[in-house]
């Protein structure tokens, strides 16, 4: 539960497919997020990475539950979380939900500039009337 080596160890495990069980990987994410003394934004990054790891197979409610701490905060990772949700709903052909999340990104004060660019491009390309 070292705040430097624990995240690095998890990245190594993921990069090298050393553990195949999604349950075990999620347990490791939970230990990092809940029991390791990480700086606030590093902890938020772990939450985001957990969501990325689970996005392909997660249900809507599971993904929202994972990302809720970010989307209800002022974290620098909030725009990333909203973008992930927007893309998730777009991939599920839920265009209105997707558009809502894309629009929310535009209104965030500390949103990542690359995310804002991608969002505007996506809104213009896929949601303009």
Language model segments and positions:
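Soluble extracytoplasmic domains of inner/organellar membrane proteins
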Residues: 17-18, 28-129
């Amino acid at each position: 539960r070292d705040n430097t080596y624990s995240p690095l160890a998890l990245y190594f495990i993921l990069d090298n497919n050393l553990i195949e069980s999604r349950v075990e990987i999620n347990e490791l994410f939970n230990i990092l997020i809940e029991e390791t003394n990480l700086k606030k934004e590093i902890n938020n990054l772990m939450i985001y990475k957990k969501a990325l790891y689970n996005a392909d197979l997660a249900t809507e409610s599971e993904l929202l539950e994972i990302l809720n701490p970010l989307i209800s905060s002022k974290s620098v990772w909030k725009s990333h979380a909203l973008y992930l949700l927007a893309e998730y709903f777009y991939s599920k052909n839920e265009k209105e939900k997707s558009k809502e999340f894309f629009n929310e990104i535009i209104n965030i004060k500390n949103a990542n500039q690359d995310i804002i660019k991608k969002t505007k491009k996506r809104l213009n390309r896929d949601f303009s009337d």
